[in-house]
Amino acid sequence: ESLSSSCNEKITTIKNEKVSQIDSDNNIQVVTTNSSTHFGKIIVDSRSNIKQQEIKSPLIHQAFVGSEIELTKERFNPDEVTLMSFIKKENQIEFIYILPFTKKRALVETTVFSIEPDLKAIENTHKEILKTYEPYKEIRQEKAIIPMVVISPFGEKRILKIGIGGGMMRASSGYSMRRVANWAIKIGERRLSEDNISTFRHRSNKWLNYLDKIFLNVILKYPEKGPYLFMMLFRRAKMPPLIRFLSDKPSGADLINILLCMPKRLMLKGLAKKKND
């Protein structure tokens, strides 16, 4: 809301245009699209275009297909969530996520971590999984491929990057909602201007980024160990530190607790590969 109010009272929404280039001309930002040109003093850029020079870790992709379904019979337990039910596949990590809303209604999602995920193959697997719940009604479906990578966004003078391009996605999970929420709370009601744009930039916890780099190295080199890595984390970690770790607000003690829960030999292999990269 504070960003919107910073754009004066009138906001014009322009649809069906694709940004091809952003340039600076005498402190005026020039946005060139496939059909027109736009000008402004400040650009808020929410695109996910990551430059090669900004990448600071292995680049892995998370692909998912999720369906919210409603059954004719009661088969779900609203008090239980299935976070990761792993499917054994070569050279990738694949699992099912089930979030029940009622005894008959739930979100069922098939997710893959891979360098080059095949979304069509994931859709086919997802269809087979849904067959086990027949008869059902599909209320909605979501699918996407998102990057899992640690980035260090360039701080361009009059361009504020937000979202994936602004480093707001957690590399080890592909999840951005928590970081975006934390960032929104931090900026509060302040108004964006040319003088304070640097204070609006998201800054990731360097220790979280360091651990995420090691994690990405492990699942890149040893994808078959992914299920073991996750199981050790959720079995051994104390719940409050784990929640703060996953919520992007860990203390130093939380980070130590998480490290002690991880398979040491496997993490050392990830660390060794990181140093060699």
Question: How would you label these PLM feature ranges?
Answer:
Residues E1:
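Glycine-rich active-site loop/strand segments that organize a redox cofactor
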Residues S6-E138, M148-G155:
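Predominantly flavin-linked oxidoreductase catalytic cores and closely associated redox partners
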Residues Q53-K56, I60, E156, S173-I187:
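A short alpha/beta connector and helix-capping loop motif
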Residues K89, I93, K143-I162, A171, ...:
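FAD-binding beta-loop-beta segment adjacent to the flavin cofactor pocket
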Residues I98, K103-R105, G155-S173:
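Short FAD-binding loop at a beta-strand-to-alpha-helix junction that anchors the flavin cofactor
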Residues T111-F113, Q141-A144, G165-G167, S172-Y175:
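Histidine- and/or cysteine-centered catalytic micro-motif in compact active-site loops
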Residues E116-E142, P153, K157-L160, N182-R203:
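Flavin-binding catalytic cores
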Residues A181, I185-D277:
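C-terminal helical "tail/cap" subdomain of flavin- and related membrane-associated enzymes
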